Amino acid sequence: ELFFRTKALPITVEDEVWIGGGSIVLAGVTIGRGSVIGAGSVVTKSIPANCVAVGNPCKVIKWLKPKYKIRPLEEEDILEIRELFRNTVLTVNSKDYTKEEVEDWASCGDSVEHWKELLAKNDYIGALDGQGRIVGFSSMNTEGYLHSMFVHKDWQGKGVATLLLSEVEKMARGYGVHKISVEVSITARPFFEKRGYKVVKEQRARANRLYLTNYVMEKTL
């Protein structure tokens, strides 16, 4: 038996969720896609996607490894990756940059024509979830410059960026490149450092109107 205590707020249960018998889900809670709720749990706050959660109150005890599909991105993907880019910058990067800075940075992706130019100059790949939605993307050019790496705010810490980085590093080797260079944000620096990238210099790089702090990093393959 399963109890939903809704009061005035809705409960959202996303696709491929399993909820054990005797569980109680309180008002306003969202249970993310692919998650498992243990029997008899009391879900008092939202549960993220792809995890196992149990207890009273219900807590995440294990992350489930989601399966992603990698494919090249084309012009028809522009609207989706533009929205992902904007939302990621405004949310994920806001912990390291001011509101004015992230808004200026996000505005760099407003132009569809600019995205077309980027797709023409770089090889873009996307990571897709089980529903075919793009949850992250990255790009590399034939000279070994890693141009972009962005992961949807709801898919942070779930292996998306690690998979994308592995794929673009394979691309670089295929180009015959022995060193990758990349400009990374304050937010992304720890991720790249853990994967063997070294800071060459700190700089102030122009976004749209403003100059933001980032780092030139390199890795020898």
Predicted ranges, named:
Residues 1-27, 65:
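Flexible, glycine/small-residue-enriched loop-and-beta-strand segment within the central core
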Residues 65-79:
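Conserved N-terminal entry element of GNAT/NAT acetyltransferase domains
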Residues 14, 26, 152, 183-185:
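Residue-level recognition of the GNAT/N-acetyltransferase active site
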Residues 72-75, 83-154, 165-167, 171, ...:
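Acetyl-CoA-dependent GNAT
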Residues 181-183, 198-216:
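Conserved catalytic-core motifs of GNAT/GCN5-like acyltransferases
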Residues 172-185:
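Conserved GNAT acetyl-CoA-binding A-motif
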Residues 192-193, 197:
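Conserved active-site tyrosine of GNAT-family acetyltransferases
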Residues 22-34, 41-44:
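Beta-rich strand-turn-strand
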